[in-house]
From Swiss-Prot:
Superkingdom per UniProt: Bacteria
Gene Ontology annotations for the cellular component aspect, listed alphabetically: ribonucleoprotein complex; ribosome
Subunit structure: Part of the 30S ribosomal subunit. Interacts with proteins S7 and S18. Binds to IF-3.
Xref: PANTHER family: 40S RIBOSOMAL PROTEIN S14/30S RIBOSOMAL PROTEIN S11
Name of the protein this chain belongs to: Small ribosomal subunit protein uS11
Gene that this sequence comes from: rpsK
Residue stretches of biased makeup (Low complexity): 1-11
Residues passing through the membrane, by range: none
Keywords: Ribonucleoprotein, Ribosomal protein, RNA-binding, rRNA-binding
Pfam families referenced in this protein's UniProt entry, alphabetically: Ribosomal_S11
Family to which this protein belongs: Belongs to the universal ribosomal protein uS11 family.
An example molecular function term from Gene Ontology annotations: rRNA binding
C-alpha cells in the first residue's frame, strides 16, 4: 500500500518527457577552456537534449580534455537519437580543446553530420583580454 500524503504537504508534479519525432536538427558545441557543452536542438532552436563534460562525470581540469568532450557529445547524441534524430548541422563556438573530438563522436554514434559552421564570436576590439599566463 503506498504511503499517504500528509495534510499540507506540497504535491510535486512530474512532467513526463514527451517523445518528439525530429529527423533533422542542429548540434551546438560550446567549447571553452574549462568545459564543453553540447546541445542538440530542432531546426527552430528548441533544445531536445544536452550534455556537458561536467554532467557526464568529470570534475575540475579533466572537464577541459578532448575525451570529456567526446563523452559529452556521445551522451547528447544518443538522447537525441531516441527522439528520432538522424541528421544534424553542427555549430561550433569557442576556443576549447574539445571541438573536433565532439564532432567526430557525433558521427561515430550514428548521426549524419551535414554542414559544420564556426560561430565563435569575434570582438571588433571590445573587452580587454585577460593577461598572458607566466608558467
Amino acid at each position: 500500500m503506498p504511503p499517504k500524503a500528509r495534510a499540507g504537504a506540497a504535491v510535486k508534479k512530474v512532467r513526463r518527457k514527451e517523445r518528439k519525432n525530429v529527423a533533422h536538427g542542429q548540434a551546438h558545441i560550446k567549447s571553452t577552456f574549462n568545459n564543453t557543452i553540447v546541445s542538440v536542438t530542432d531546426p527552430t532552436g528548441a533544445v531536445i537534449s544536452w550534455a556537458s563534460a561536467g554532467q557526464v562525470g568529470f570534475k575540475g581540469s579533466r572537464k577541459s580534455t578532448p575525451f570529456a568532450a567526446q563523452l559529452a557529445a556521445e551522451a547528447a547524441a544518443r538522447r537525441a537519437m531516441e527522439h528520432g534524430m538522424r541528421k544534424v548541422d553542427v555549430f561550433v563556438k569557442g576556443p576549447g580543446s574539445g571541438r573536433e573530438t565532439a564532432i567526430r563522436s557525433l558521427q561515430a554514434v550514428g548521426l549524419e553530420v551535414g554542414q559544420i559552421s564556426d560561430v565563435t564570436p569575434q570582438p571588433h576590439n571590445g573587452c580587454r583580454p585577460p593577461k598572458r599566463r607566466r608558467v
